[in-house]
Amino acid sequence: MQLDPGLVTGPEMYRFLISAVVPRPIAFVSTRARDGALNLAPFSYFNAVSSVPPLVAIAIVDRPDDPKDTLRNIRETGEWVINLVDEALLPAMARTAGEWPRTTSEFEVAGLTAAPSERVAAPWVRESPLDRKSVV
């Protein structure tokens, strides 16, 4: 299949890319806002990009008029945690995927434990088998 990026819409390109890159790892990203509000959200545009130094990348769609809480928190603090999602965590992760008010903690929505991190202010998901603390 050939696809000319100049001839398709953004949503069409998105659907193509998410169906073409499989299996797609999920970054379950936890952040803390400057005011202390917690956020937890899944992102499917995520991957490891280097082992030395260890680097990962996530892509968050920017909504100029109303940025996602995850992006807003990373911009405010420069810190986030990527939590690994295993099969047991899938139902809880799915509950966090909706649009929630900024003051709503998706940890509570999903029934997950926000565990304190040692190196960053953002908590990690205690139920996750692996996490990666990150700083911009």
Stretches with model-predicted labels:
Residues 1-39, 47-136:
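Active-site-proximal mixed secondary-structure blocks
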